[in-house]
């Protein structure tokens, strides 16, 4: 029984003839039509087209999807006639094909692919031309192949690689910003705690150095009302009656009221 990857490997072996008949291509000389195995790639294209129309607001959406489903059914029948088994059209998609081995031993059954797995550039040679829901095909060619190779094509339906990397950079900046704020706040708290501990130690040290400690001449704390007591004569000089305040603060009365 044939698996999807078996079908893909067979199709890759014939992929150099999928553009035939075309007199401009040397390999198409004498070829009157493309091999039926090429239906795999046509079916994968239809699956991408179906996905795009599925999420569009175009008034012709229903009509277009109906036609696409008919075309998908034709390709599925073609593959069934070749391999004698009915493959689910949902299994024949670019992102699933990417995971298939071209050749289990050499990695290049068709002779034109050098990688063990089908990479993004390989799929493009087979007809893969994505248009994402977000970003479309914007800046697809702006990214080097080394970068594109690291991004699975499964994301292409939703967000193109250039936009994805842009969003990842923004996300990374946000994460680094949050990390910076957390570290800064933590360091500030530690610094304040350290200063507080130093003030306590300094206070204890100063108190221990008091020559009159534990004697009848031990220093007493400053009067908490000292500032108010100093301000009262100032207000009295301006003509205010401060008798009640003098009484509350334990100051001697003055006949100024």
Curated annotation (Swiss-Prot):
Induction: Expressed in the late phase of the viral replicative cycle.
Any single Gene Ontology cellular-component annotation: host cell membrane
Membrane-traversing stretches: 123-143, 163-183
Topology term for the membrane: Multi-pass membrane protein
Protein location: Host membrane; Virion
Entry keyword set: Host membrane, Late protein, Membrane, Transmembrane, Transmembrane helix, Virion
Family: Belongs to the asfivirus C257R family.
Protein name: Transmembrane protein C257L
Source organism of the structure: African swine fever virus (isolate Tick/Malawi/Lil 20-1/1983)
Taxonomy of the source species: Viruses, Varidnaviria, Bamfordvirae, Nucleocytoviricota, Pokkesviricetes
């Amino acid at each position: 029984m044939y698996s999807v990857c078996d079908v893909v490997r067979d199709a890759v072996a014939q992929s150099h003839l999928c553009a035939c008949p075309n007199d401009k291509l040397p390999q198409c000389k004498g070829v009157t039509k493309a091999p039926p195995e090429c239906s795999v790639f046509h079916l994968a294209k239809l699956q991408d087209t179906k996905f795009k129309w599925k999420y569009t607001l175009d008034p012709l959406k229903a009509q277009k999807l109906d036609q696409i489903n008919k075309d998908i059914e034709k390709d599925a029948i073609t593959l069934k006639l070749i391999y004698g088994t009915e493959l689910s059209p949902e299994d024949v998609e670019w992102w699933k094909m990417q995971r298939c081995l071209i050749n289990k031993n050499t990695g290049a059954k068709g002779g034109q692919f050098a990688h063990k797995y089908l990479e993004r550039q390989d799929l493009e040679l087979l007809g893969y031309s994505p248009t994402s829901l977000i970003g479309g095909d914007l800046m697809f060619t702006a990214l080097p192949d080394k970068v594109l190779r690291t991004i699975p094509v499964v994301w292409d339906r939703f967000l193109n690689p250039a936009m994805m990397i842009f969003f990842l950079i923004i996300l990374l900046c946000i994460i680094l910003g949050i990390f910076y704020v957390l570290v800064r706040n933590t360091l500030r708290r530690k610094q304040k705690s350290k200063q507080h501990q130093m003030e306590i130690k300094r206070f204890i040290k100063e108190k221990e150095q008091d020559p009159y400690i534990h004697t009848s001449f031990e220093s007493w704390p400053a009067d908490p009302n000292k500032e108010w007591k100093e301000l009262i004569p100032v207000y009295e000089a301006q003509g205010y009656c401060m008798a009640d305040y003098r009484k509350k603060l334990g100051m001697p009365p003055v006949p100024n009221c």
